[in-house]
Regions:
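Catalytic glycan-binding domains that act on GlcNAc-containing polysaccharides
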Residues: 31-32, 37-162
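Selective for proline/serine-rich intrinsically disordered segments
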Residues: 6-7, 27, 114
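Sec-dependent N-terminal signal peptides of Gram-positive bacterial secreted proteins and lipoproteins
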Residues: 1-23
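Sec-dependent signal peptide cleavage junction
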Residues: 19-34
Length: 162
């Protein structure tokens, strides 16, 4: 007798998802703990192509504070998904420079940084990596902005005050 014939499909799917969650918790408990709950951000922004709830969800799943992500979006692009800065090098909502993040783009399947969802997914991944490396938002934001922990201190302070 096959297992599928004794267990209803919805129960089977639920069991698989639960086991997947347990495996995630064992492999990487920090990720599981961070995605157990949804952080609702205080900052609400009007961005075409992506909802506040979607930004909150992407940020939370990436293990970063949605308020910080939205503050970056406001600071970097003013919420314009078509923003281009730094002489054409920084693109989209979170003003990401693809020349520095090509490998991460490929890993995540990011095709267009002008796509608001893809831009936020990559921006959150970058910020999460930096937070993991430096252990605090001040240094992570400074490096996100300037490439080092010193030159972007004023930027980090502005983001954290929003």
């Amino acid at each position: 007798m096959k297992i599928k014939s004794i267990i209803p499909p919805t129960l089977f799917i639920s069991a698989v998802l639960t086991l997947n969650g347990i495996a995630t918790a064992i492999d990487n408990p920090q990720v599981y703990q961070q995605t157990e709950y949804k952080v609702v951000s205080n900052i609400q922004i009007d961005v075409k192509g992506i909802s506040n709830e979607m930004i909150d969800d992407i940020a939370t799943r990436s293990g970063v504070d949605p308020n910080i992500v939205k503050a970056i979006i406001v600071e970097e692009s003013g919420g314009n998904p078509n923003a281009v800065g730094d002489n054409g090098e920084s693109i989209g909502l979170m003003q990401i420079q693809p020349k520095h993040h090509q490998k991460r783009m490929e890993e995540l399947g990011i095709v267009s940084l002008f796509d608001p969802q893809e831009n936020v997914i990559l921006g959150c991944a970058i910020l999460s990596d930096l937070y993991d490396k430096y252990g605090n938002y001040e240094d992570a934001l400074s490096v996100y902005n300037s490439g080092n922990t010193e030159d972007g201190k004023a930027y980090a302070e502005r983001i954290l005050k929003k």
